[in-house]
Amino acid sequence: MIASLTDWNQFLSQHPSAHLLQTGEWGELKSAFGWEPVRVISGDVGAQILFRKLPLGFTVGYIPKAMNSDQLSVSSEQFWNEINSICKQHRAIFLKLEPDLWNDQQLETWNLKLETSPHNIQPPRTIVIDIKGEDEQILAKMKQKTRYNIRLAEKKGVTVRAWDDIESFHRLMLVTGGRDGFRVHSLEYYKRAYELFHPKGMCEILVAEYEGKPLAALFVARNGNRAYYLYGASTDEERNRMP
């Protein structure tokens, strides 16, 4: 069935490992920038599909970070039939699926007629770090050079705090994107993301400063038992302070 936003959020509350990109808030963010979110629940499985309009009334469908292979398996035939029906209703010319899997071999258990896309939307690889424990325990798991740089930054007067200056964050992103050659979202995009996630305790912007001047910033988001490094930025100045 197609679920309302309220029903979808209630469904996700039973799945604490669900990816951030499957949350209702993420769907609402994308809806402000040209995508239509459709949430589908069939028994104990579900997915949020994003549709984007094309010329002549067609669309493309996209499921980012769908639930793991144990939930979306060949046994979920009714679920996939519903997905297929909804895609037809939206006149989707294709459905792009980027599942939340530990390895590509897990796709084989789905027994679906999938074709590998030559293009990724999300990064194809993700590093997962266990951050349980006290600060010293976490530091002890890092490489010696990393610990050195962290302590050097502290020694050189770099401080870190929560930040809500979205315009300054966007300016840092523009500097970083220009330097490293990647596309940066609009100011309105970051503002909307912050407005959707922050009041619910689902995101924070952290800024590293020296004498009140922003040197680097991180937009981190959280859902369930996982946090995500979404966007990071840094200035070209004071890099010797290891911000």
Regions found by a protein language model. Give the residues of each.
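A conserved beta-strand-loop-helix scaffold within acyl/acetyltransferase catalytic domains
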Residues: 2-57, 99-104, 111, 115-241
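Glycine-rich acyl-CoA binding loop
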Residues: 76, 242-243
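Divalent metal-dependent hydrolysis catalytic cores, especially in the metallo-beta-lactamase
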Residues: 91-99
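Short, basic, low-complexity termini and linkers enriched in Ser/Thr/Gly/Pro
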Residues: 44-45, 66-92, 104-119
